[in-house]
């Protein structure tokens, strides 16, 4: 395929067209591109492979170089491996103070994970729109992130206005503010519920209670069916011969309700086939 160089020579070609009269007026960009030409040629040129002109392979230079004593290096030495695994050559791990504070807070308060959270975010930096001079926000619920951002604000404010606080002191101050607000929130919720009950409010069952009720309905039906099948199984064992009655009773005592129900279903299938 021919090398595409038209984009890089647009100024020269336009000048030629203006000179020969193909273009009557200069384009609006002509003077700007002439005053500030591009510094980098982005044309992709094919790599010409000629004998003894190609750069040596770094693998060959590392593992295949000949020494003065006539030996050839075929594997990396301990020093080479040490330099290869050096921390300078590794990609640095990103560490943020916010992540460390979150780890500490949720390690101390694991039940905060059980509170419902909004997982839908537009940009992920909604906390920047909040005023962290106070912890309670209008458009954000009280959670561990409030403690983290409040701690960072206290640290920044103490450096400007003083007295200077350490990280531990700022975290403790934000944590106790969180405790007071959380206790006030739970107290208001409890008082509001008691007042509603006093005025005759009837609260519906929770999702957990509703699930237990539905499960109990199926358990009651199963208990009735299991009781009936147990009676049928005991009656069938009573009709056995007297010689094998002792062994059958011992075997029936060992079988469970589930096994007896399976035996009854198998017997019914045999009767239907006959």
Curated annotation (Swiss-Prot):
It comes from the Eukaryota. PANTHER family: 37S RIBOSOMAL PROTEIN S25, MITOCHONDRIAL, SMALL RIBOSOMAL SUBUNIT PROTEIN MS23. One of its GO terms (molecular function) is structural constituent of ribosome. The gene is RSM25. The keyword Oxidoreductase does not apply. GO terms for cellular component: mitochondrial small ribosomal subunit. Its main location: mitochondrion. Component of the mitochondrial small ribosomal subunit. Residues 233-259 are annotated as: Disordered. Keywords: Mitochondrion, Ribonucleoprotein, Ribosomal protein. The lineage of its organism: Eukaryota, Fungi, Dikarya, Ascomycota, Saccharomycotina. This is Small ribosomal subunit protein mS23. It is found in: Mitochondrion. Disulfide bonds: none annotated. Pfam families: MRP-S25 (PF13741). It comes from Scheffersomyces stipitis (strain ATCC 58785 / CBS 6054 / NBRC 10063 / NRRL Y-11545). Belongs to the mitochondrion-specific ribosomal protein mS23 family. Coiled coil: none annotated.
